[in-house]
Amino acid sequence: TDTGEYIDPLQFYTDRIKDTTAPRATHVILYPQAGKGVVAGSSQKKIVPLNAPGTPVEVWGKIAAGIKAYDYMDGTSNNYGVRSVKLFVDSMNVFSSKVDGFLPDENRMINAWTDYEEYATKSSWFMRSQILPGNTWRMLEANEEGGVVTIDEERPYIFRYELEDLYGNRRSY
């Protein structure tokens, strides 16, 4: 583009490329906020596989989440980034991202949106559902706490992710 923005070229070929495959997730990650939250009795982040649905994780205090997910298309084994991610807690939208382009000088913001430590050490790509302090990337929106959720009652909290691609193929977890 004239501004140097990288854009998703797929939006120009939707009439020529078929896609009926919804994005898929494999794991979520829970981030207790330093000094303010715990996950499974620990102050360390915890990765939870999604192949064990309904398995509760005990958390308390201020918690953020993230998801490991990819988009796929018909007729290929390639994986792609997920265009739209929304996190709902008890049916309230606490975070959303819609990635359809970015400027070269926004790379630092992308690294802050992802769990860069997981990527650098394990080549594992988690998208945070939290806006870290200083991250002003225009593709992210969150609640007043930047996507952080306060768990302060002994009751089930229902976290639900909604993933969607350019074609409107959607899957929830």
Specify the residue positions occupied by each region the protein language model found.
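Conserved, short, structured surface segments that act as functional micro-motifs
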Residues: 1-24
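Short hydrophobic alpha-helix segments
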Residues: 10, 29, 97-98
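Long, low-complexity serine/threonine/glycine- and acidic-rich segments characteristic of extracellular
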Residues: 33-173
